[in-house]
From Swiss-Prot:
Belongs to the adenylate kinase family. AMP binds at R36, N57, L58, I59, G83, F84, P85, R86, Q90, R157, R169. Pathway: Purine metabolism; AMP biosynthesis via salvage pathway; AMP from ADP: step 1/1. SUPFAM superfamilies: P-loop containing nucleoside triphosphate hydrolases (SSF52540). It comes from Wolbachia pipientis wMel. This is Adenylate kinase. Residues 30-59 are annotated as: NMP.
């Protein structure tokens, strides 16, 4: 089974992806994690990507698609793609690569739909563990140690630090989603991401079960 999950910033893609790969025994390919790892390497590419991310702009398709192709070469056709594709061009690329490698396309597309104001509030308060990638809200999580892996490396993401960049990312997401919804019509599961984590998980699993019948 090949699943892709996307949604606006703050919609809980990473959280739901972690739960889904455990539930369905899938390999995870997270574009966001790949980019953050490159940024932390301080390479020339990392510096270039960091500048793009901090301004709220999208990374060039050529870079994203190259990273994805490399990752797909390492997994079989039981995987979940977190945050990819982000536009119609990337969707066409993904179809081409999957057809070449597995003679198939994506099976299920999960879209997490989130109110913009809630997204902004979540991003302003988001705190991430640099080691296990667990996410917390600074308004409710007061510890300096990650509850999951006990790391003390808790930080705000660089792309959450600037309000104008946040607004730009959300606007760009809505703009790109129009074409993606049409492209994946028939495979698209729309989920209310304004709900609690458990409620969102239940809705996703219920709709996936119905889709697999």
């Amino acid at each position: 089974m090949i699943i892709t999950i996307f949604g606006p910033p703050g919609s809980g893609k990473g959280t739901q992806s972690s739960l889904l790969i455990a539930k369905y025994n899938l390999k995870l390919i997270s574009v966001g994690d790949l980019l953050r790892n490159i940024i932390s390497s301080s390479s020339e590419l990392g510096k270039k990507i960091k500048g793009t991310v901090e301004s709220g702009n999208l990374i060039q398709d050529e870079i994203i698609c190259g990273l994805l192709r490399d990752q797909l070469a390492l997994v079989d056709d039981n995987c979940l793609l977190d945050g990819f594709p982000r536009n119609l061009n990337q969707a066409h690329f993904l179809t081409q690569v999957l057809q070449e490698k597995y003679n198939r396309d994506v099976d299920i597309v999960v879209e997490l739909q989130l109110d913009d104001n809630i997204a902004i509030d979540r991003l302003k308060n988001r705190l991430a563990c640099l080691d296990c990638k667990n996410i917390y809200s600074v308004s409710s999580f007061k510890s300096t140690t990650c509850a999951k892996c006990k790391s003390t490396r808790l930080e705000k993401r660089i792309d959450d630090a600037d309000m104008s960049a946040i607004n730009k990312r959300i606007s760009e997401y809505h703009l790109q989603m129009k074409g993606l919804r049409e492209y994946y019509k028939g495979k698209l599961l729309t989920i209310d991401a304004n709900l609690s984590v458990d409620e969102v998980t239940q809705e996703i699993e219920s709709k996936i079960s119905c889709n697999l019948v």
